A protein has these predicted regions:
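Exposed beta-strand and adjacent loop surfaces of beta-rich binding modules
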Residues: 75-77, 128, 176-178
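Catalytic core of DAGKc-family lipid kinases
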Residues: 1-112, 118, 165
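Short low-complexity stretches enriched in small and charged residues
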Residues: 83-92, 123-130, 150-162
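Short, low-complexity, polar/charged sequence segments that are solvent-exposed and flexible
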Residues: 64-66, 94-99, 109-111, 123-128, ...
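Internal helical hairpin/lid segments
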Residues: 102-145, 151
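A short, structural micro-pattern
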Residues: 72-74, 99, 123-126, 163-165, ...
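Well-ordered beta-strand positions enriched in small/hydrophobic/aromatic, beta-favoring residues
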Residues: 76-78, 131, 169
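ATP/nucleoside-binding phosphotransfer catalytic cores, i.e., glycine-rich phosphate-binding loops
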Residues: 135-205
Length: 205
């Protein structure tokens, strides 16, 4: 069950038997993809690093993950069809040719992309994805100003940036556009069908 406002999230307990330690979002995604393609259950993920780990307050302490002080959390999973090819992401999807020109789409399950606080109000277990769609026409100067604010998460509304918080979204590009999932480029696509899978992951921090 996704988190409800003002309700506690997760419970104390160590990484379960069979749990897998991951040190980045890319490592977490690799575990997810392997088990989804095999049709097997995704094991609990012990988060030692990455943007999802930072979003949920992870400390990167392996000893803690194996102790009763650890916290076990239900976490949503991002799912995307890239021109009909199925993939998953744990923290974020980015589709762009360049940060500084052209259209940019960021779909956030977590809060961070590296040092950038992209989705300060996002939560990885609220059943929704935070979608930021930057129009091709957004001037370079405005992009640079937005980048400076990303480090602190102090976003200012801009007419060239469409923001949504939705369980699913369809994105269409006029030509194939490179797509990154959890920081790794996975190919290019024109049509992206994206949705959240609530409570699909168990993460331990």
């Amino acid at each position: 069950m996704t988190i409800e406002k003002h309700q506690p999230w997760g419970e104390h307990g160590p990484l379960p038997a069979g749990g897998v330690l991951v040190r980045s979002d890319a490592e977490a995604r690799a575990v997810v993809e392997r088990h989804r393609r095999a049709g097997t259950e995704i094991p609990a993920l012990g988060l030692l690093g990455g943007d999802l780990c930072r979003t949920v307050g992870g400390r990167g302490d392996e000893g803690r993950l194996r102790s009763p002080d650890a916290v076990v959390l239900p976490v949503d999973l991002g799912s995307v069809l890239l021109d009909g090819r199925q993939h998953w992401f744990t923290s974020h999807l980015v589709a762009r040719r360049s940060w500084w020109r052209g259209r940019v789409v960021a779909v956030m399950n977590g809060q961070w992309i590296g040092r950038w606080d992209v989705a300060p109000k996002g939560h990885p277990n609220d059943g929704r994805l935070d979608v930021y769609d930057v129009a091709q026409a957004m001037p370079l100067g405005d992009r640079l100003a937005a980048r400076r604010r990303l480090a602190s998460g102090t976003h200012v509304p801009h007419p060239a940036i469409e923001v949504q918080r939705v369980p699913a979204v369809q994105v269409e590009f006029d030509r194939p556009t490179p797509v990154w999932l959890d920081g790794e480029r996975v190919g290019s696509a024109r049509t992206l069908s994206i949705r959240t899978e609530p409570d699909a992951l168990t993460c331990v921090v």
